[in-house]
């Protein structure tokens, strides 16, 4: 699973490996949407996404300097930013639940927004990978 040192082109095994990572993230989203879990809960705490993030970190050094590096960064950032936004949503919603009872609504809307964002990032990244293109990392899409 290496990169050609002369051209910086990732080997086909690394491309396939990256497809597997997107597949695990997509599986977590689908299980969350179709099952009793939430999309966000399954994405952050379900085994498919946890395995995918571990796989990202395990092979991150092998994709450095290739177009796959953008995919690994995209996948890792998706996971950690989803976690961050869930924590922020929970911190904002908890006192609103206790004080006004509207925190349930802010919690649901916040987690729904994170779920849509996660699904968007998985789809956008996987489509770019299918086209053998890097994911353009724009900070506005975080």
Task: Name what the model sees in each region.
Residues 57-70:
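Membrane-helix interface/capping segments
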Residues 9-12, 60:
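Alpha-helix initiation/capping motif
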Residues 59-62, 117, 121, 131:
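Residues in soluble alpha-helical coiled-coils and helical-bundle/repeat scaffolds
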């Amino acid at each position: 699973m290496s990169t050609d040192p002369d051209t910086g082109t990732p080997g086909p095994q690394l491309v396939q490996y990256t497809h597997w990572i997107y597949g695990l993230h997509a599986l977590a989203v689908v299980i969350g949407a179709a099952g009793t879990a939430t999309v966000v809960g399954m994405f952050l705490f379900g085994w498919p996404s946890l395995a995918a993030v571990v796989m990202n970190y395990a092979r991150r050094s092998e994709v450095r300097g290739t177009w796959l590096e953008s995919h690994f960064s995209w996948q890792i950032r998706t996971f950690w930013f989803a976690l961050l936004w869930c924590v922020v949503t929970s911190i904002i919603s908890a006192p609103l639940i206790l004080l006004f009872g509207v925190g349930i609504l802010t919690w649901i809307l916040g987690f729904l927004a994170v779920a849509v964002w996660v699904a968007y990032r998985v789809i956008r990244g996987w489509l770019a990978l299918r086209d053998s293109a890097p994911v353009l990392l724009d900070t506005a899409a975080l």
